[in-house]
Amino acid sequence: AAIKQALDSIAANPGFVSMPNGDIAEQIKSGDVIAGISGVWDVMNVKEAWGENYGACKLPTYTVAGKEVQMSSFTGYKMMGVNSYSKNKEWACRLADWLTNQQNQELRFKEKNQGPSNSKAAESEEIKKVAAIQAIIAQSQYGTLQRVGNSYWDACKKFANTVLSGNNGGLSDQEVMDTLVNEITASAVK
């Protein structure tokens, strides 16, 4: 219940606005959003709106039951795979090697500001200067590997809508939290 109350407090703040993924970029460009929480997928939009000197940091802390708690996040990675049963396996392997080589990962970084997965490309001094990548590195100690199914996203969307509406639908805060947990952990097989 304390977590639900903390989230209610955040959502009730007049400076807080929730918006669908993708909308934050448009709101930044229009000047309606001056700070926000998003992912590296929005870096190019942020750079376009705010310039090269934009700032980025790890997620903030918030207060739950009188204690400061660090917001957590999901972490993930990009992976290049090749189907071993492909009739063009050799060409698929060559394409994977080409896409993940140092030169192309450096090009991807330059054009998309995405951190490279190639270890040699990742050693670049230029990467150490990118605020968004440094923020991800700082946040990574609070992250959890993203291994969730659709039941997680559906349950969290329903929970977020409840928090944002300020209406528990007659349920106590604890009942709302219990429903969230039950829906996340429910088997996909019915």
What function would you assign to each model-found segment?
Residues G22-D32, G36, S165-G169:
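Short helices/loops that flank or line small-molecule/ion binding pockets
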Residues A1, V69, F74-N83, W153-L164:
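Periplasmic solute-binding protein
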Residues I137-K190:
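Conserved C-terminal helix/tail region of periplasmic/extracytoplasmic solute-binding proteins
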Residues I34-G39, G55-A56:
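Paired acidic/hydrophobic, glycine-rich loop segments that form the ligand-binding mouth/hinge
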Residues A2-A6, I24, D42, N88-A92, ...:
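Stable alpha-helical elements in mature extracytoplasmic
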